[in-house]
Amino acid sequence: MKSTSINISRFFIKTYALIQIVFALILTFGGAYLLYLGGSIYYLFTGILLLISGIYIFRIKLSGTKIFAVIFVYTLIWTMWEAGTRFWGWIPRLATIAIFAFFLTLLLPYFEHGIRKKIAYSFTGLIVICFFTAGALAWYPYFTTLDNSQIPQNTTNTYHSVSAQPDDDWRYYGRDTQGTRFSPSNQITPENINQLKQVWVTRTGDMPPIDKKNKWAAQTTPIKVNDALYLCTATNNMLKLDARTGKKIWEYKHNLAYEKLPSTAVCRGVTFYTSKVIPENEICHEKVIEGTLDMQLIAVDAKTGKACPQFGTKGHVNLLEGIGHTVPGFMAVTSPPPVVNGVIVVNHKVQDNQRRTAPSGVIRAYDVDTGSLKWAWDVRQPNRHGLPPKGETYSRGTPNSWTVMTVDEKLNTVYVPTGSSAPDYYSALRTEEENQISTAVVALDALTGVKKWSFQTVHKDAWDYDLGSQATLLDYKDQSGNVVPALIMPTKRGQTFVLNRITGKPISNVVERQAPKSIIPDDVRSPTQPWSVDIPRLGFSDLTESKMWGISPIDQMLCRIK
């Protein structure tokens, strides 16, 4: 009976040893190639030691387990050195070795001159503790950085048209026309924020039908003007709430037809405007304006919520005029249009990932009081600023802009973050005019729609790197003491560009770096892409060998080789 037990134990030990030997051979050959490429020596060194250990274990020699113990210890140290507290950095480096160690400790009593079960299983317990420790690290934040540099003190407002509003107001999507997103209010501090309690809650009641699949997105940013909040729901109903109580003062129902929805119902905000033309005691002296998912521009009285009779047709402007053929949901206004020097500038999203003949990405401006068209900027028709001639449309398939625009009233400029031409992922059919302004910041004259300048953040974008952030305006003194009117534009690439907003020239250093080539016939990529090298990149730092992914040492080794 004892002989049978020994034979079974030896069978398990030899089986384990064979698995370890196969694993070791893979690491040895792969590690040798990695070292040849200039990579880490760990995999080759560990593969050789695991191979020696496996041979001794196959011969039921306890010395094989001692070699493995050395491997485990230095692998643990190496993991801590390379991965720190990054949970997913521990998994490929240590998890497989720890699993081998777990089974090996269970077999320790059955080796020649093996150790007692009590001691062996205490090692097993330590391995289990390691697993729990690694699991605990899964909840620990990693890949985070903290910038401790001081806030620059040389900012000015020489060029700013500062938005006059009380400190506790938030009158624009980005708090002010410059998109600074900064409130000087100081009642809430890091010291008392944990004491905040809910005072009120309100529900818009705008929910998707139970039997429908479209997504409803709660993306609205309410604006606060005096004691009222103004906001829009996912399907463009507008509400005015008492800021202190949350009580609904009025609601404007747009009654958007379900079949006109895009894939996602979303409204990011509304625009508040005090007229310089309409007398104070007349309706719509103060108005709330929104663009809608069914391509309408709507203005309502801020006091009553009633449609402005002077604006368009009964408070509505048809944004489909001049667009030509489209289908419901293919176009939509999702961001609040800004007002600058008496005109309201409107952009819109387009389903630009399906066909080259998608509707135009034209940018248009309307009189903020009457709703009459003031100008249009059509990329392929730069000298035509009105409606297209009868029988024609705005240029189809051109880059659209769907995010929030920024304006500078003193410079009479609207800054438009653009996306790519249709279709998103194939660039061979685009015109040179489109290629110049896709995925770029474009500065337009607010009174005429004439392009002043453009700065491209991605050349010949075929990756849907649309600019999705609002630009922020900031003025500061350069090294010579001159005041520079600046524009800050973050991007999906994690690159942040700082530009002179008068000229569009970079203030921070921008270099062109070599980019991968395309393997798609006739769809040539740009040989270089712009990099803002003076500004810290958002997201991960440059990829290195030690940051390669994997679940086991084998696939991480292959990723390092790749």
What name fits each language-model region?
Residues 1-152:
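Topology signature of small-to-medium multi-pass alpha-helical membrane proteins
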Residues 184-191, 198-230, 255, 323:
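Asp/Glu-centered strand-loop micro-motifs enriched in Gly/Pro and often flanked by an aromatic residue
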Residues 193-207, 238-260, 274, 278, ...:
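Extracytoplasmic/lumenal domain signature
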Residues 406, 526-562:
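Long, low-complexity segments enriched in small/aliphatic residues
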